[in-house]
Amino acid sequence: KQLPHLSFLETAKEQSFMSKYEVADRYQLMWRFRTNSMFDIANYYSMHPVLLDEHFRSLPPIINFSNREFYGNRIRVMRQNNPNDKILEIVHVPDGKVDYDATRNLPEIEALVKRIHEIIVDNERENPDNPITIGIISPFRAQVEQLKISLSKVISDYMMEKHKIEIGTAHTFQGDERDIILISWAFANNSFPQSLTFLQKPNLFNVAVTRAKNKMINFVSKDFTDLPDGLFRSYLS
């Protein structure tokens, strides 16, 4: 349920390698690197696949949704949380909307940047020698780029590096983690319906919501009760 590999190998180049090394026609579909990774091939030929079912990264409230939706509750969560901690948080942005070309949700960005500033100020005051690591995710590239611009105006390069602040799509965080993850979903009442289809792609969604170790903060501009059935509505509810 993770993201597949990304290949920038041109189709023509790939075919030329097939011809050069005389790969038989019956094997070419399997050995096309544009569509199959070495992991895919190993998995195809595996007689007895093993599920790595122990999860050490996230606190239970963070991983429980993916465990249920994607892994059939087969994952054993090895961490325990303090029931008094607010681990999952939803920040509703009532004036959130996407701009004229439906690529950026500026009110969400403003709310998220403000929250990050508060997190850093609190951490620097209370425990400056143990900096919280922070990740910022959005499903949409334009939102990511605007987040980088807006955050750079408020947070210094020194603090960005100290708190290992990374901003990107789910692809950026594949295999990575942070103490706190903030997600700007960027979907609003005036968003194109196709945007919802995109952000609910299972692999992308699963990676996005499982990068946090200790806390997840979701910024949303649309009430979940107004969303159609699907991953996004189920997650927010």
PLM region spans:
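Conserved helicase motor core of SF1/SF2 NTP-dependent helicases
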Residues: 1-237
